[in-house]
Design a protein with these regions (language model features):
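Intrinsically disordered, low-complexity basic segments at termini and long loops, enriched
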Residues: 1-90, 101
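Structural signature for extended repeat/solenoid scaffolds and their inter-repeat hinge/linker regions
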Residues: 90-428
């Protein structure tokens, strides 16, 4: 499309081309919010929900600004190269918002969400030497380890590990394991794994031995994108010589197994910004018919819709469902299911509504009351520190009236506390 190279590409964009016979009628069609049979894509019709419209005619193009389910259509350009007496191509440039709070899996996280940004003047060799000296001889300088590893990005830590091996002939992770212990060791080792390998390790540990930590599996599978899950599966097979899906099937059963496998297969359309209001209404009616309307529950209907629809679509489904059932989808799930299946379904809903709120809740309840769920605390701080931890911290304060740092200070101690606080950073 002409002139497109000059446009700044700050957000994720998609070009959608429509074919129309009469170029004079299409603005009115858009203004009336009704899809026209004349406006078609090669693969499907485009349906638009009720929304706000603003039309500004121009000699060269018509600008239409409206928001629907996270996508912003900013302009419609007539393509003069393909125009003819019978047909005009109309191209829509669709720009997705940078900070989408609800449709979590299309959010492009800004730098302000990252709490660990690494060293701007990074050199792995002196860092490796500092770590070697901190662990050489009798005793360990834990603070030196904290100062280096919590203030470097994961990519920088991998370079430090390579330099450590090259300079001293030792594996850094194994050396750290031999010098550290307890929760502090667990946190530092978590920092040393590449992100997908770390999450693969968490899944492996959740299933090995007697018993299964279903909550860990649910958290990871429900909150990651399709591409992230594919990378985790790849890392899992490389590190443990086993297929993640097969291991989940072997370690779980019933409807919990089905929803976990469905989530792992990544059937959700992460990229779709379109909502078909008719399909959303039908899904809401199907969910109502599968639960509140009948005696018993059609669990597979819930699983199919929750695990295969995009987040933007599900948000519309939840709205329609509440109108039909006079109660939220969360309340219906609580009344229709129980145990780990209930937890899995509710997690999908929470992640769909607001991913940052979900992680804030996980961190809060990891520290609330007697004892600390250190695995949950470590996993979520480490895995989100280079993605959106600052945004999670903001949501944490809104939800609970206290900062994440203050709760960590109250609930942890020693080197473990200091390392966590370094990763979290200031959230006053």
């Amino acid at each position: 499309m002409k002139g497109e190279e000059q446009r700044p590409r700050e957000e994720s964009q998609r070009i959608v081309c429509l074919r129309k016979r009469d170029e004079k009628e299409w603005p009115a069609c858009w203004a009336s919010q009704k899809p026209s049979p004349a406006l078609q894509r090669e693969d499907r019709m485009i349906h638009f929900p009720s929304t706000q419209w603003k039309i500004s005619p121009n000699a060269n193009h018509t600008t239409v600004g409206f928001l629907f389910s996270g996508a912003l259509v900013i302009d419609h350009h007539k393509n003069p190269e393909s125009a003819s007496k019978e047909e005009t191509n109309v191209c829509l440039r669709i720009k997705r918002p940078r900070a989408r709070k609800e449709a979590w899996h299309r959010t492009e996280v800004e730098q302000e969400g990252v709490s660990v940004k690494g060293s701007p003047h990074f050199n792995p060799d002196p860092d490796a030497e500092t770590l070697y000296k901190a662990m050489k001889g009798i005793g360990t300088n834990e603070q030196a380890i904290i100062d280096v590893l919590t203030k470097r990005s994961n990519a920088q830590r991998q370079q430090i590990a390579k330099s450590f091996k090259a300079q001293f002939g030792k594996d850094l992770i194994e050396t750290l394991k031999s010098e550290l212990s307890g929760k502090f060791e667990r946190l530092i080792i978590a920092l040393m794994y590449p992100p997908y390998r770390y999450e693969a390790k968490e899944l492996y540990d959740a299933m090995k031995g007697i018993g299964t930590k279903e909550g860990v599996i649910i958290e990871i599978l429900a909150s990651r994108t399709k591409n992230q899950l594919q990378e985790i599966m790849k890392a899992y097979e490389e590190d443990y010589g086993s297929n993640l899906e097969e291991d989940i099937k072997a370690d779980t059963s019933g409807y919990l197994e089905r929803i976990l496998v469905c989530l792992l297969q990544g059937s959700r359309d992460d990229l779709s910004g379109y909502v078909d209001p008719g399909l959303a209404l039908q899904d809401a009616q199907d969910l109502y018919a599968a639960g509140e309307k009948i005696c018993g529950t059609d669990e597979m209907k819930f699983i199919t819709i929750l695990c295969t629809r995009s987040a933007t679509h599900l948000l519309r489904v939840f709205e329609e469902y509440e109108k039909i059932a006079n109660k939220s989808i969360e309340d219906s799930i609580k009344s229709e299911t129980h145990g780990s299946l209930e937890e899995a379904m509710l997690t999908v809903v929470k992640c769909t509504r607001n991913l940052h709120s979900y992680f804030a809740e996980r961190l809060y309840f990891a520290m609330k009351g007697a004892g600390t769920l250190d695995g949950t605390l470590i996993r979520n701080i480490v895995s989100r520190s280079e993605i959106d931890l600052n945004l999670i911290k903001n949501q944490f304060k809104k939800m609970y009236g206290k900062t994440l740092s203050s709760m960590i200070m109250e609930d942890t101690s020693g080197d473990y506390k200091n390392a966590l606080l370094n990763l979290v950073g200031s959230d006053l």
